[in-house]
Design a protein with these regions (language model features):
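Terminal leader/tail segments of proteins
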Residues: 1-109
Length: 109
């Protein structure tokens, strides 16, 4: 895991705003408990601080960018495993699309 991802995990666990290089973690506008993770300004994960498992993202997205960096940032999150096989992305073992939002909790067996 990259150093930036270790720092990101710490920020998420403490719900502390984080910004370094191309990655930001911040409170979502207009919400009390909603947080988002962005890569290059594109949201790739949403969190509910008041949820049952607040450090596991409510939804994740490749934001149309199935890249090594996007997958690496998402794989640094609790409850998320993104893999690619033959250019097809998989979230926690289930096939997903490059675009759209996916719930890691609803995909677990």
């Amino acid at each position: 895991m990259r150093k930036i991802e270790l720092q990101l995990r710490e920020a998420i666990r403490n719900f502390r705003p984080f910004s370094k290089q191309n990655t930001t973690f911040s409170r979502m506008a207009g919400t009390e408990e909603g947080w988002q993770l962005c890569l290059h300004g594109n949201p790739i994960a949403c969190f509910d601080q008041g949820g049952k498992h607040p450090t596991i993202p409510t939804y994740v997205s490749l934001a149309g960018w199935n890249t090594v960096t996007t997958r690496s940032r998402l794989n640094a999150l609790d409850g998320v495993e993104i893999r690619t096989k033959n250019f097809t992305p998989y979230l926690n073992g289930r096939e997903i699309e490059d675009n759209g939002w996916w719930s890691p909790c609803n995909l677990n067996y």
